[in-house]
UniProtKB/Swiss-Prot annotation:
Catalytic activities: GTP + H2O = 7,8-dihydroneopterin 3'-triphosphate + formate + H(+)
InterPro entries hit by this protein: GTP_cyclohydrolase_FolE2, GTP_cyclohydrolase_FolE2/MptA
BP GO annotations: tetrahydrofolate biosynthetic process
Keywords, sorted A to Z: Hydrolase
Protein family membership: Belongs to the GTP cyclohydrolase IV family.
Cited Gene3D superfamilies: Urate Oxidase (3.10.270.10)
Pathway recorded for this protein: Cofactor biosynthesis; 7,8-dihydroneopterin triphosphate biosynthesis; 7,8-dihydroneopterin triphosphate from GTP: step 1/1
Site (May be catalytically important): 159
Protein's name according to its UniProt entry: GTP cyclohydrolase FolE2
Function as written in the Swiss-Prot or TrEMBL entry: Converts GTP to 7,8-dihydroneopterin triphosphate.
Top-level division of the source organism's lineage: Bacteria
Assigned EC number: 3.5.4.16
Source organism (scientific name): Polynucleobacter asymbioticus (strain DSM 18221 / CIP 109841 / QLW-P1DMWA-1)
Gene name of the encoded protein: folE2
Amino acid sequence: MNPAFLKASAMPDVQSSRDERALPIEQVGIRGVRHPLMIRSNTGNFPSVGNFEMDVALPAHVKGTHMSRFMALLQKQDEAIDSTTVVALVRDMLPLLDAKEGHVQFTYTHFVKKAAPVSGVESLMDYEVTWMATAKQNDAGSVEVELGLRAQVPVMSLCPCSKEISEFGAHNQRSHVTMTVVLDTQTKMTVEDLVSAAEREASSELWGLLKRPDEKWVTERSYSNPKFVEDLVRDVAGRLKADTRIQSFVVDAENFESIHNHSAFARISHKK
């Protein structure tokens, strides 16, 4: 092979050539990229795998973006992930891609070590988490970042109507509370903070491992704290509304009904 051919200066850079169609592209990039991560949590760092989407806006006169540079940026990412590193990642992307606007989002499994309510036995709970960040460079050259966080939290709900009309017990089920929030980048919110907002408002939170005294506690706790899906979504929304770190939010609650072959759901969105 001709060594001169391997020199970048000797290769045509087609993607940087001029495009004459006068059509800017709002988003162009890569998705479905799996990449190892170290996650920072309230109880220490742990490894996970993120599924990434990264894109930039492309001006009308430019034929293509620098696709390989998205991966190059990921390869350099070696800090534990939290809100600060997510903001830094999307900021670093703009000059590297010669872009004025860019977006990064990735989903991973977040683990929290929890102690059972009575026995204290510890186990891990898993939550599906997505970080989202959009960076825009204004005419003055400064970069503004919008930071978002989404967490899907499994909880337990017990039906108030079933409790009221039944001589014994009440139907209950697992529920999912999915919260998508836009954060103030000048403050710090952890994944555990967001997860807690859902777990505190459920009939009961969940644990990976429970002993019999714990199971008794969960059963009695949920029975004394019944909630419709409407109650659940309103109570979680009220907690998010009161959190000054959150600028806007969407809360989705879904009950996987144990007495029906369908789900019940509710949604609240709010911008402060």
